[in-house]
Amino acid sequence: MDRTLESLRHIIAQVLPHRDPALVFKDLNVVSMLQEFWESKQQQKAAFPSEGVVVYESLPAPGPPFVSYVTLPGGSCFGNFQCCLSRAEARRDAAKVALINSLFNELPSRRITKEFIMESVQEAVASTSGTLDDADDPSTSVGAYHYMLESNMGKTMLEFQELMTIFQLLHWNGSLKALRETKCSRQEVISYYSQYSLDEKMRSHMALDWIMKERDSPGIVSQELRMALRQLEEARKAGQELRFYKEKKEILSLALTQICSDPDTSSPSDDQLSLTALCGYH
């Protein structure tokens, strides 16, 4: 722990040279510090040059407790884990969680290396009841994860978050299974989706998937939404990374809104990402 704290102080001294490392997390102006941290990273490494720096979102509420989210360059999302009596307090608390994770992300142990990949694959095998042989088989979920990590060698886990979230969502809504049935390899799927960001276009396509599921299993969207909201709240209160749970909530909310406003909605628009487009790529 002492070594980790010393490493964090060293990182703060490098990225925020005019800040006192001992006072960083006690500074009430943590919102500006988080912004300064990522601006400094962009200047030093040209990281995420085409993206905004830090984006905040406050949930509408008539009164406390208030909830605020902050999304970092690369896609990682964090929220306030404390019970906050004002929107400003919630925003500061979310920024503090994000800053701590941003600093930890600079540690060597958070960079994707061969050793990191080996440890991550072993953890994935343990959590899926698979075997290490699965890591060499790209048709398995562990193999796909292994391939994604190797394709992003040298990046940090926060830089890897956007692509990871996309594949978590594709697995969650059944798209990966559907793509396997069309004979698309995991490598082709990864190469295809690596070109895209998780934006409104992709959310609309995934919402359409759930609209179709609702027709086969009435009530499944509201059931999944309740689960996603519970997962999001539990993860936020635990100070965990939230992007996957938050995107699930956004996609399901969009699907439910469309179902309620137009029960006959079923046709995708031409500009939406679709399985057909990927099969054409294949």
Curated annotation (Swiss-Prot):
One of its GO terms (cellular component) is cytoplasm. InterPro entries: Autophagy-related_EPG5, LIX1. GO terms for biological process: autophagosome maturation. It comes from the Eukaryota. Belongs to the LIX1 family. This is Protein limb expression 1 homolog. It comes from Homo sapiens (Human).
